[in-house]
Amino acid sequence: MREYNFDGLVGPTHNYGGLSPGNLASQSHVGEPSHPRDAALQGLEKMRFVSALGVGQAVLPPQPRPSLHALRALGFTGSDEEVITRAAREAEHLLRLTSSASSMWTANAATVAPSADTADGRVHLTPANLSQMYHRAIEAETTHSVLRAIFSNEKYFAVHAPLPGSGHFADEGAANHTRLATPGHAGVHLLAWGRSAWQDVQGPSRFPARQTLEASQALARLHQLDAKSVLFPQQHPEGIDAGAFHTDVLAVGNERFLMLHELAFVDHAGLLAVLREKLGQDFRAVVATKAELPAKDAVKAYPFNSQVLTLPDGTMAIVAPIESRETPAARQFLERVVAEDTPVKAVHYLDVRQSMNNGGGPACLRQRVWLTDEERGAIKADVFYTPALHDSLAGWVRRHYREVLRPKDLQDPQLARETMTALDELTRILNLGSVYDFQR
């Protein structure tokens, strides 16, 4: 079984809308000009780098934005141009919400369980409903369509519908999920949550907790996971209030290794004790304290929103944002991870600033899917990374993406036409078929 990182292509409407309360980077860059072409090329460069390390790499397409489907559902009628013009005039905030390129953060696209862990021996995928934020909730339908197109062979894959789109079952996807495993032990799934729909638990006071316990429990049932191999740790309210709106802002795990901040989970010490019992002596964890790495620095530099990757030689490497190198406390923590008795032997720093400015580091940009060779062969879409695909996608970006996008540019109907033209071509490049509503 091999891990594949399905990275989200940054969409043509990448902009700084400041749409997510609790996402400090998003709020601090609101209204600034963005650079969609650079953003997409930075994402492709990360894919190239990860693939060159010998790690499985694939791609997921962006979604059509502005979402004319969503705007029409909100009462704007007429031609595409009339819908956009009227929304810009009457409810500019709705145009911003429906123009977000946030689907690039595919860690929120779905939660995935490998066939080795599921009762029916299939890979299970559930698109996240993302119901807490409107600009993200409108992604779920298209995500479901895309995943069904890629993972279409029902002998190997079970693609579920998103959980019911209510606050009771608010689901943020794999950004709150970690799978750990050691040789000779069953994989352990951490399905974290920040609040409960029915239980009285202490929550954050400054920023909203997005994922519910009930959603995490439903995912475990849908994916047919053994109850003994699932843990439901609560996100630390203080961590959420510091800006860790998803678990992957303060924790990241891979196979037998977990690195986390002490504010990632309530009772992290108790959680680690249970993990050692379930995973055995090969399990390794490194904890950053508030004294060593203040939460504000962790949220600013995103050392935990790194990718921890298993290399072909069995060692691990961290792919971190360049901000982690530029922030002394974050850099020193990552250096300690390498120096200690862990599988991690190297840290690589990459420039994904266009995404970071909106609150998304390397880990946000990828969805992990574990596949056997047979399962990999059952996927017929051309989504797996090759140098030839890289060149094709880079050329596609340069042909279709604007160099600079300013807030007022979202009001230009031509932008929607450019995006649909680009995505129509992309579905042919990736051999996806008609996955978008404008293609049907």
Swiss-Prot record:
Keywords: Arginine metabolism, Hydrolase
UniProt-annotated binding residues for substrate: 17-26, 108, 135-136, 210, 248, 358
Organism: Myxococcus xanthus (strain DK1622)
Catalytic site: 172, 246, 364 (nucleophile)
GO molecular function, one term: N-succinylarginine dihydrolase activity
Recorded family membership: Belongs to the succinylarginine dihydrolase family.
Recorded name of the encoding gene: astB
Function: Catalyzes the hydrolysis of N(2)-succinylarginine into N(2)-succinylornithine, ammonia and CO(2).
Pathway: Amino-acid degradation; L-arginine degradation via AST pathway; L-glutamate and succinate from L-arginine: step 2/5
The keyword Hydrolase belongs to this UniProt entry's keyword annotation: yes
Identification of the protein by name: N-succinylarginine dihydrolase
Residues making up the signal peptide according to the UniProt record: none
